C-alpha cells in the first residue's frame, strides 16, 4: 500500500502547532509521511517572560536560533522529523507585522518570488505530497509572512512537476471558535478570552474538512508548550495565548478549506484530508 504523504507550509515556528498541530500528530501516528516546511525562523516574535527576553530582535537578535530548538522539540512531540526551512535555515527572515519597522533585506515578505517558489517547488518534487496545506490569501490574520506563504505555496503547487492531488487552507470555523471559547475551563495567567469579532474565521458553509484530533490532544498541547517564548498554555491545557494575552481554545477539531482537487465526499465536511485521493 502506498504511504500517504502530507506537506504543510507554515511561516514561523509555532504556526504549525497553533492551527495544524493535531492534524500533524494524527497523520504521523497513522503512518503517513508528514513534511513540515517552515519559511522563517521567527526572529521578530515578541518574547513572553523575562528568561529569554534579551534574545529579542531589539537586543541580542538571537531569537531565531533559539526557536529552531523550540520547533524541533514541538515536532518530536508531534511525531515528525525536522525541521525543514524553506531555502535552508536563515535564508528568509521573519518580516514582522505589517505596521512594524521597514523590512529587513532578507524579509520573507519581500523575497524574490522566483527563488522562493523554486525552493518550494523542489521540495514538492522531492517529497511528492498527495496533500498540501497552507494559509488562505489573508494569511489567517494578515501577517505578511503568512500571506507570502500562501502566495508561494499556491504558485509552487502549480509549477511542480509532481501533481498535488489536494491543496487546503488551514482556517478557523466560526461555529468552532464559538463552541471552543465556551468550553475553556482555565485561562493562562493574566489572559482574557478572545472576543469573537477579533478572530478572523470562515463561515461553516465554506469549510471543506473537519479533522478530529481529540485522540492526539496530549501531543498537540505538548507541542504548543514547547514554543514557550511565544505561547502560554493554561495548566489544564484547555486554552493558550500569545504575547497579546488573548486566550484561544485548544481545539479538538481542526478545519480546512479545499482549493485544489476534488472533495472526497458528495455532501458535508470531509473527515480525512486524503479522502478521494488515489494512492
Curated annotation (Swiss-Prot):
| Pfam annotation, one family | PIG-L
GO biological process assignments: mycothiol biosynthetic process
Q: Which InterPro entries match?
A: GlcNAc_PI_deacetylase-related, LmbE-like_dom_sf, Mycothiol_biosynthesis_MshB
Cofactor(s), names only, from the UniProt record: Zn(2+)
- Cofactor binding description: Binds 1 zinc ion per subunit.
Catalytic activity annotation: 1D-myo-inositol 2-acetamido-2-deoxy-alpha-D-glucopyranoside + H2O = 1D-myo-inositol 2-amino-2-deoxy-alpha-D-glucopyranoside + acetate
UniProt-listed Enzyme Commission number(s):
3.5.1.103
- What is a GO molecular function of this protein? zinc ion binding
- Keywords linked to the UniProt accession: Hydrolase, Metal-binding, Zinc
Residues that coordinate or bind Zn(2+)? 12, 15, 146
What family classification does the UniProt entry report for this protein? Belongs to the MshB deacetylase family.
What is the purpose of this protein? Catalyzes the deacetylation of 1D-myo-inositol 2-acetamido-2-deoxy-alpha-D-glucopyranoside (GlcNAc-Ins) in the mycothiol biosynthesis pathway.
Protein name per the record: 1D-myo-inositol 2-acetamido-2-deoxy-alpha-D-glucopyranoside deacetylase
Amino acid at each position: 500500500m502506498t504511504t500517504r504523504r502530507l506537506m504543510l507550509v507554515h511561516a514561523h515556528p509555532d504556526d504549525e502547532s497553533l492551527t495544524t498541530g493535531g492534524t500533524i500528530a494524527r497523520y504521523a501516528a497513522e503512518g503517513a509521511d508528514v513534511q513540515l516546511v517552515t519559511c522563517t525562523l521567527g526572529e521578530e516574535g515578541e518574547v513572553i517572560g523575562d528568561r529569554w527576553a534579551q534574545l529579542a530582535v531589539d537586543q541580542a537578535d538571537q531569537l531565531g536560533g533559539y526557536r529552531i530548538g523550540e520547533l524541533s522539540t514541538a515536532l518530536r512531540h508531534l511525531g515528525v522529523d525536522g525541521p525543514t526551512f524553506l531555502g535552508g535555515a536563515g535564508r528568509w527572515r521573519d518580516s514582522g507585522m505589517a505596521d512594524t519597522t521597514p523590512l529587513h533585506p532578507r524579509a520573507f515578505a519581500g523575497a524574490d518570488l522566483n527563488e522562493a517558489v523554486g525552493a518550494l517547488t523542489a521540495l514538492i518534487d522531492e517529497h511528492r505530497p498527495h496533500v498540501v496545506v497552507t494559509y488562505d490569501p489573508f494569511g489567517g490574520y494578515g501577517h505578511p509572512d503568512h500571506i507570502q506563504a500562501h502566495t508561494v505555496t499556491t504558485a509552487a503547487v502549480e509549477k511542480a512537476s509532481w501533481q498535488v492531488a489536494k491543496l487546503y487552507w488551514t482556517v478557523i470555523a466560526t461555529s468552532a471558535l464559538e463552541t471552543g471559547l465556551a468550553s475553556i475551563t482555565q485561562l493562562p495567567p493574566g489572559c482574557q478570552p478572545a472576543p469573537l469579532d477579533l478572530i478572523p474565521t470562515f463561515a461553516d458553509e465554506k469549510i471543506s474538512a473537519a479533522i478530529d484530533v481529540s485522540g492526539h490532544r496530549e501531543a498537540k498541547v505538548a507541542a504548543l508548550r514547547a514554543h514557550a517564548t511565544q505561547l502560554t498554555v493554561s495548566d489544564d491545557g484547555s486554552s493558550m495565548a500569545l504575547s497579546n494575552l488573548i486566550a484561544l481554545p485548544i481545539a479538538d477539531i481542526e478545519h480546512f478549506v479545499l482549493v485544489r482537487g476534488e472533495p472526497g465526499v458528495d455532501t458535508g465536511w470531509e473527515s480525512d484530508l486524503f479522502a478521494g485521493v488515489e494512492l
